[in-house]
Amino acid sequence: MTTWLLLVAAIVSEVTATLSLKAALDRPGLYALVVVGYLASFTLLAAVLRRGMGLGVAYGVWAALGVAATAVLSALVYDEPLTLLMTVGLVLIIGGVLLVEGGSQAAGTRPDPLPHPGAHDGAA
């Protein structure tokens, strides 16, 4: 699985857990899904970092797209308000994420391959 697909999976897990948190208020059995969703999200985010994606990019994309997806889906699922001003804010968040990612690519930062287990830097 590519690093970006792992990040998308982390975002989907986090959004699922967050939406389930509201549903669990009325159906406590859903708290298990909340816990599993957050554990999966952080595990996948750690895998993304392990593959070499920069923390600023990975966390920025994860948090921003999680906020945007949660806002849109909570409007659809829970009939929560999504005003024009909120929508403009979400567009700005997504634009900011694109700028951060573009800046990362311009700086030449790419995910590094994992070091071979047992490899060392030669220091004694």
Task: Set out the residue ranges of the language-model regions.
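Polytopic alpha-helical membrane proteins, predominantly small-molecule transporters/carriers
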Residues: 1-124
